[in-house]
Amino acid sequence: MDSDPPLVRDVFPDLIAELADLLMAEGERFLAISVLDVRLVGECGCADDFCRSIRTADHPPGQPYGPGHRMVPLLPQHGMLNLDVVNGRIMYIEILNRPR
């Protein structure tokens, strides 16, 4: 039996709390609720020292998300946080220029 990847909230609780607050501030109530249940599928893998981005769903690297995709930019106090969302599902959390 395969086990599910860990919940991001269990690995990075402060990040998820911040994302939920920022999403509510942007009027993204559905995403603010759903971010609590995203899974840590994998790291970005780009090896850039300023990138801490994570994949929250399976998706072939380098392929476009296609129809239903939107990018949700957020306004954190430090660095950059953006979400790739497809048909309401958070696929990727872009985390750039943030302290470790």
Model region roles, listed by residue range:
Residues 66-100:
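Short, compact, well-ordered microdomains
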